[in-house]
UniProtKB/Swiss-Prot annotation:
Record-given protein name: Isoleucine--tRNA ligase
Co-factor remark: Binds 1 zinc ion per subunit.
Family statement drawn from the similarity comment of this UniProt entry: Belongs to the class-I aminoacyl-tRNA synthetase family. IleS type 1 subfamily.
GO MF entry, a single one: ATP binding
Assembly behavior: Monomer.
Protein localization: Cytoplasm
Keywords of the record: Aminoacyl-tRNA synthetase, ATP-binding, Cytoplasm, Ligase, Metal-binding, Nucleotide-binding, Protein biosynthesis, Zinc
InterPro entries, per the entry: aa-tRNA-synth_I_CS (IPR001412), aa-tRNA-synth_Ia (IPR002300), Anticodon_Ile_BEm (IPR033708), Ile-tRNA-ligase (IPR002301), Ile-tRNA-ligase_type1 (IPR023585), Ile-tRNA_ligase (IPR050081), M/V/L/I-tRNA-synth_anticd-bd (IPR013155), Rossmann-like_a/b/a_fold (IPR014729)
Predominant cellular place of this UniProt entry's protein: cytoplasm
Record note on domains: IleRS has two distinct active sites: one for aminoacylation and one for editing. The misactivated valine is translocated from the active site to the editing site, which sterically excludes the correctly activated isoleucine. The single editing site contains two valyl binding pockets, one specific for each substrate (Val-AMP or Val-tRNA(Ile)).
Motif mapping: 'KMSKS' region: 622-626
Name of the top EC class for this enzyme: ligase
Pfam families: Anticodon_1, tRNA-synt_1, zf-FPG_IleRS
Organism of this sequence: Burkholderia cenocepacia (strain HI2424)
Length: 945
């Protein structure tokens, strides 16, 4: 280490111990950080951490894989840096905490990119080959971005869902859940995107406002006598009229097959200008106003009395193709919040409609399903064949009006389902898909998937705790999981299905293993090119390859199987200690992982779930291109340093939204400078200190040094408690207070006189340096998880022989005898010092003194304060940073005060104290007695400070 004098003017004659350090005041982070990234990689620092951690208890944070598409954004930075802080803090806490990053590689976004670049007519094999190449290129690009943020991990050996071994293990995982009896095939309404041409998972659906036509439509009486009887009438007063429904999806009217009423709601038969209308009694007044009609209630009946009545389709008079009737089915899901209290049911396009019609005896072959996968009606649909459903909406409204069935039509803005990729509206559409049944009893007769998953939620620790109820209610209320997708770039559901019955081949489990072996060698392309005869021989005449692929949420949702216990089983283990993602993953990765592990293992794949919020600007607005308020982590790293991003994330309560703006970054940068200046002071004042040669035993330290170490040890205990619970913002807040107030504002301030003016090798100075040595060890380690670049830079100056700070564990401070009493005593002294500082400031403002060293103070104190102050003896002046200090005993707190007077003595040229003995030695007329002693004799004796 360097031992240069920082200022040669006064020191030339009477030197002070003002030392320098190669740790610069300016961080110059954008320039230095990339050099550290290169050095960490070149020197294999991650591997050294792993070697140092060998044999310790494992802590596994399992990386939720980002999608291998596009540049990293601020949300990625938040996620990866939080993970890095967790992993580094767990390693330093004495765990073996590896970090294996991963990527999600299959699925629609990459297929879309390939279509954009090469068109839609590529053969499947070529789509796969180009998709693999594209994903690889994107991963490499993102990898550079993540490393630049200071994230340490096994970047040379990440997991990728498209690696052959992972693809093969996914097929084996599918085999496991089939064997256990969770998988079935059925016709069911699923989230369907016309642009994807595929079913969507719940997590791929987002809600946005959309304006649609809302219509009230009458289904005319088909059984007037039965209807009259249901209402307790001998006959209907008139023939015209019917039952009225309200819907926001006119396009579903052509597929109507039933009407739903609540069994307990009271329905009214209302005589109006448009005939007799059946409406829920409590909606009559609102509906009459909406329809611009006047009405008189003729009779009422509960819904249960109207069950099985039939009504004509509202387009029956418009085209013979609609000459059918709709029965009334009872359903508890019907409400009277809006509309008419009557729900029209198109079972192919709604979950509740589907369940209701199934419960009333309809079979799959009974369902009318005229909407094709691209969103157009089949050509044979009367009146609207070939039209897209959205284009058909106004035409259907017109046709209903012409048929005399329309009572009202207006525009309605509501929150509606959209595809998260295409941002286009989606629908429920009944298709034949493979499902994992939430309420299916498995083969072993055990608990259902829903029951097992809910138990898994209960057994998991949540950070923050509100996540538990959120995930619990999602699992409790979710439908069966649609496992199948109609895509090319995905892991195949590698079944052979009977050409006529759709049944699985009887040897399915065995065949899945055969396919998995081939995929392990050649990737999913092996299934694409497989001739069925190779595996099933002549059965190929009866069975064909299933063309569906697995939902990509199954890819990432089974990483606990194909990564933790598969491709990276030597480094990782099951279950993981922690999954850490954004709060949207309660319905995404947390959710799918829980379901797959519940099916395969009967438990959750994680012990803990940590969720963080999303980034917003300084005014709390979401970041968007239209607002122009987005912040690019690359730009910030290149301008201010990745360390500033890391400090911003660590200092923010991530359980809510994370606000960022230039003003916020400016404040973070100021906080960073304070920490850096503290480190620079510590390192400079240790630059001539060799612990082996100069360390002073604890029991010989000055009292304030023992206090500083005891206080720092107590603080570290608090900080490690926060780290343990993943509470990083209190860690940062307490460390910033520690650096600016406990060290900079007190201990280091008091220490300057002793460090600079005591004899270089005196016990007093070496005691201070020994304490600073321990403080620096402790401080750098607790900073390292979040201020990784700065801690490493300081560590290389502090411990140049050590490879890296990241192989260290949290510091074991030396034990200080009576530490609790010492901390309590010095809390009192610091309180008094605060009062003295205030009095000095008032004297300075009144021009009675210049600096605090020009002052002599008398502290009037009582009780414990008096005892604490007098125990310091003559060292009290050093604690108060005055040239003289006396203590006057008073009876009680009310009499306590501070008197400040300007010293009448001369100022020492070297230590700047005003002392009576300045010039006592004629040959040194500007030097005080203690400086003379420190320079030319045995040096002053201090005991406390």
């Amino acid at each position: 280490m360097s031992n240069k004098k920082a200022d040669s003017k006064p020191q030339a004659k009477y030197p002070v111990n003002l030392l320098d350090t190669p740790f610069p005041m300016r961080g110059d982070l954008p320039k230095r950080e990339p050099q550290w990234v290169k050095e960490w990689e070149a020197r294999g620092i991650y591997e050294k951490i792993r070697a140092a951690s060998q044999g310790r208890p494992k802590f596994i944070l399992h990386d939720g894989p980002p999608y291998a598409n596009g540049d990293i954004h601020l949300g990625h930075a938040v996620n990866k840096i939080l993970k890095d802080i967790v992993v580094k803090s767990r390693n330093m806490a004495g765990f073996d905490a590896p970090y294996v990053p991963g990527w999600d590689c299959h699925g629609m976004p990459i297929e879309i990119q390939i279509e954009k670049q090469f068109g839609k007519s590529l053969p499947a094999a070529e789509v796969m080959s180009k998709a693999r190449a594209y994903a690889t290129e994107q991963i490499e690009k993102q990898k550079v971005g993540f490393k630049r943020l200071g994230v340490l991990g096994d970047w040379a050996n990440p997991y990728k869902t498209m690696n052959f071994v992972n693809e093969a293990e996914e097929i084996r995982a599918l085999g496991k859940i089939i064997e256990k009896g969770y998988v079935y095939r059925g016709l069911k309404p699923v989230n369907w995107c016309f642009d994807c041409g595929s079913a969507l998972a719940e997590a791929e659906v987002e809600y946005k406002d959309r304006t649609d036509p809302t219509i009230d439509v009458m289904f005319a009486f088909a059984e007037p006598e039965k209807t009259a009887h249901a209402f307790g009438l001998p006959a209907l007063p008139r023939a015209e009229g019917g039952i009225v429904i309200w819907t926001t999806t006119p396009w579903t009217i052509p597929a109507n097959q039933a009407l739903n009423l609540h069994p307990e709601i009271i329905y009214a038969l209302v005589d109006t200008e448009r005939g007799l209308l059946i409406i829920a009694e409590e909606r009559v007044e609102a509906c009459m106003t909406d329809f611009k009609l006047t009405g008189r209630v003729v009779a009422t009946a509960p819904g249960v009395k109207l069950a099985n009545l039939r009504f004509h389709h509202p387009l029956a008079s418009a085209h013979p193709g609609y000459k059918r009737t709709a029965p009334v089915y009872l359903g508890d899901y019907v409400t009277t919040d809006t509309g008419t209290g009557v729900v029209h049911s198109s079972p192919a396009y709604g979950i509740e409609d589907f369940m209701s019609c199934k419960a009333h005896g309809m079979t799959d072959s009974d369902f009318i399903n005229p909407v094709m996968g691209d969103g157009r009606y089949i050509e044979s649909l009367p009146l609207f064949g070939g039209l897209s459903i959205w284009d058909a909406n106004p035409k259907i409204v017109d046709a209903l009006n012409a048929a005399g069935s329309l009572l009202r039509s207006e525009k309605y803005t509501h929150s509606y389902m959209h595809c998260w990729r295409h941002k286009t509206p989606i629908i429920y559409r009944a298709t034949s898909q493979w499902f994992a049944g939430m309420d299916v009893t498995p083969q072993d007769g055990g608990k259902t998937l829903r029951e097992t998953a809910l138990e898994g939620v209960d057994a998991t620790a949540f950070y923050p705790s509100w996540g538990k109820q959120r995930l619990f209610s999602m699992i409790a209320n979710r439908p069966d999981w649609t496992l199948s997708r109609q895509r090319q770039w995905g892991v195949p559901m590698a079944f052979f299905v009977h050409k006529e019955t759709g049944e699985l081949h009887p040897r399915t489990l065995e065949l899945l293993e055969e396919v998995a072996k081939r995929v392990e060698q050649s990737g999913i392309e092996a299934w694409q090119s497989l001739d069925p005869r190779e595996l099933i021989g002549d059965d190929a005449n009866l069975y064909e390859k299933n063309r569906d692929t697995l939902d990509v949420w199954f890819d990432s949702g089974t990483t606990h199987w194909h990564v933790l216990r598969g491709s990276h089983k030597d480094q990782l283990q099951f279950p993981a200690d922690l999954y850490l993602e954004g709060s949207d993953q309660h319905r995404g990765w947390f959710h799918s992982s829980l379901l797959t592990a519940s099916m395969i293992d009967g438990r959750a794949p994680y012990k803990g779930l940590l969720t963080h919020g999303f980034t917003v600007d300084g005014e709390g607005r979401k970041m968007s291109k239209s607002l122009g308020n987005g912040i690019d982590p690359h730009e910030v790293a290149n301008r201010l340093g990745a360390e500033i991003i890391r400090l911003w994330i660590a200092s923010t309560d991530y359980s809510g939204e994370l606000a960022i703006s230039e003003e916020i970054l400016k404040r973070v940068t100021e906080g960073y400078r304070r920490i850096r200046n503290t480190l620079r002071f510590l390192l400079a004042n240790l630059s001539d200190f060799d612990f082996a040669q100069h360390a002073v035993p604890v029991d010989e330290w000055l009292e304030i040094d023992r206090y500083a170490v005891a206080f720092s040890q107590q603080l570290q205990t608090e900080l490690l408690g926060h780290y343990e619970k993943y509470e990083f913002h209190p860690v940062v807040a307490k460390l910033q207070t520690y650096c600016s107030e406990d060290l900079g504002g007190f201990y280091l301030d008091v220490l300057k006189d002793r460090l600079y003016t005591s004899a270089a090798d005196s016990r007093a100075r070496r005691s201070a340096q020994t304490a600073l040595y321990h403080l620096t060890h402790g401080l750098l380690r607790v900073l390292a998880p979040f201020l990784s670049f700065t801690a490493e830079e300081a560590w290389k100056v502090f411990q140049p022989a050590s490879d890296t700070i990241f192989t260290e564990t949290y510091y074991a401070y030396p034990e200080v005898a009576g530490s609790a009493a010492l901390i309590e005593k010095w809390a009192l002294l610091r309180d008094v010092r605060g009062s003295v500082t205030k009095a000095l400031e008032e004297a300075r403002t009144a021009n009675r003194i210049g600096s605090s060293l020009q002052a002599e103070v008398a502290v009037h104190a009582s009780g414990a304060r008096y005892d604490a102050l007098t125990s310091l003896g003559d060292d009290l002046k050093f604690v108060l940073i005055t040239s003289a200090a006396t203590v006057v005993k008073v009876d009680d707190e009310a009499q306590e005060s501070v008197d400040v007077a300007a010293s009448k003595y001369q100022k020492c040229e070297r230590c700047w104290h005003y002392r009576e003995d300045v010039g006592a030695h004629a040959e040194h007329p500007t030097l005080c007695g203690r400086c003379f002693s420190n320079l030319f004799e045995n040096g002053e004796i201090r005991s406390a400070a």
